[in-house]
Regions:
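Solvent-exposed soluble domains appended to multi-pass membrane proteins
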Residues: 1-102
Length: 102
C-alpha cells in the first residue's frame, strides 16, 4: 500500500525514488496505475526510471501518447481538456494526477 499511497498523494518524486523496490514488495508485473505514473514522471521530468526486470507495456505507452496529444490540443482551456480527456481517460492515473483535487 506504500506506493499506492504515494500516488494518491500525488508524490511522484518519492514514488520514483521507491519504485525500484517493486520486487521487494512482491510484484512480478508493474500494476497499471504504477506504470501510468512512472511513464508520466519519466516524460515530464525527462528521466528513464524503470525498475530492474520490468518493462512498460507498449499499449500503455500508446495510451499515454494519445492522452498527451489530447491534453496538448486543449491545454489552453483546462475545462475543455478535462472534459475531452474524461471521455476516454477518466479512470487513468494521468487524469487523476492532473484533475483530481486532494
Amino acid at each position: 500500500y506504500f506506493l499506492a499511497t504515494l500516488l494518491l498523494n500525488k508524490d511522484l518524486d518519492f514514488f520514483a525514488e521507491n519504485i525500484p523496490r517493486l520486487k521487494d514488495f512482491g510484484y512480478t508485473d508493474i500494476p497499471l496505475y504504477f506504470e501510468e505514473a512512472l511513464i508520466f514522471y519519466n516524460f515530464y521530468e525527462n528521466k528513464q526510471i524503470i525498475p530492474e526486470g520490468f518493462s512498460f507495456r507498449p499499449e500503455t505507452i500508446a495510451r499515454f501518447n494519445e492522452y498527451a496529444g489530447i491534453y496538448t490540443k486543449f491545454r489552453s482551456d483546462r475545462a475543455v481538456a478535462r472534459f475531452e480527456l474524461g471521455k476516454k481517460f477518466r479512470n487513468s492515473y494521468w487524469y487523476y494526477l492532473q484533475f483530481a483535487i486532494i
